[in-house]
Amino acid sequence: MSVENKVLTNKVLTAAAMVTMVGGLGAAGTLSASAATPECGDSCIKIYSTEFGTSEQPNLVETVYQGVARVGRPTAMYPISNTDPAGDIVGHRKGLVTDFYKDGLVSAEVNRHYGNLTAVEVEYAPHGKRTGLCAGLADTAYQNEGLTLQKCGTSAKTVWIIDTADSPSTAPQGHFPLVSGSTTDFTHPYAMTATHSDSTRSRHQTTAPMQIRVTRLTGSPYHVPAGQLWGTTK
């Protein structure tokens, strides 16, 4: 594992958020007051984009649209809240990509490119109650596909790779691309992307304002755009 990956593993996949998840992305920062509902508390993590904020002031975080726990429900960027359970996200699983490959969740090609990196699944848990639904994709990743809730642990489509290798300069700050475990493009892999608008509709028409999407990663290794760099806080 590279120095950058060791730094990120220590900073991002740590503490209670990771233990609870056996997964989650971890805590790169801590807010002065809890940003989750009281029932979720320290088990929750908040996933933010550097397009909108920082670990100390994330502003917008990944949130389940209207809080509905249903397969196909979009996840989008909405204001951080300690009263709205729609933003309660916990870790479901973490491990090396090669571990997900051994369990049949990612392809041999994904393992060949990313095997030594960490991958995670993150689960919707309103008021701390797990739903078995993780942030993912309905189909194998394609350009502008929107993120939606999908059953955890069943395919590569809910697996997210912490791709420190493609943005080594931001890894020490706890910011990194999140590449879909179902990507089939390894030159410009499909990565989680936050945008200011939602003008492109998905094949399934399951859209929401500020819906998170996957788009081809650009700017690697030193100029990845802010909308494709992610971090976590508690």
Model-derived regions, located:
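Lectin-like carbohydrate-binding module/patch detector with strong preference for beta-trefoil
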Residues: A36-K234
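Secretory targeting and sorting signals
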Residues: M1-A35
